[in-house]
A protein has these predicted regions:
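Residue-level signal for mature regions of secreted extracellular proteins and peptides
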Residues: 10-11
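Rhodanese-like catalytic fold shared by cysteine-dependent sulfurtransferases
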Residues: 3-6, 17-37, 53-84, 91-129
């Protein structure tokens, strides 16, 4: 018994000191939570990952358009600050999840996926900008 206690204490100590690699990921919030965040925060980017045609038909004011299909393995010049808060959306939420995963793999650290514009309760605009 005297031998087991020091061994258990050592294992406990070592397991507490072990560093666990935090899995890099993105957060998901609702559109309503996104609106509240946009009212409080500054310096964020709203990223629409739909096609250019979908973007021109209707998008969130101030959003920039980078199609999900164009997000790959290279840095994105329109998003130079990898620590900047980026709110990502698409039409229904599927492409925004894919794009968020790709952005995290590219080293972006502050990605929030907000779903699809179909659920957006706020104002939308048309055109290329």
């Amino acid at each position: 018994m005297k031998r087991i206690i020091p061994i258990l204490m050592t294992l406990l100590l070592l397991s507490g000191c072990a560093t666990q690699s935090a899995e890099k990921t993105y957060r998901q919030i609702t559109m309503e939570e996104a609106i509240t965040m946009m009212e409080k925060e500054t310096g964020y980017i709203i990223l629409d990952v739909r096609t250019a045609q979908e973007y021109s038909e209707k998008h969130i004011p101030g959003a920039i358009n980078i199609a999900n299909e164009s997000i790959g393995t290279e840095d994105i010049t329109e998003l130079p600050d990898k620590d900047q808060l980026i709110l990502v959306y698409c039409r229904s939420g599927n492409r925004s999840k894919q794009a968020s995963e790709k952005l995290v793999k590219l080293g972006y650290t502050n990605i929030i996926e907000i779903g699809g514009i179909n659920s957006w309760p706020g104002e939308t605009v048309t055109g290329d900008k």
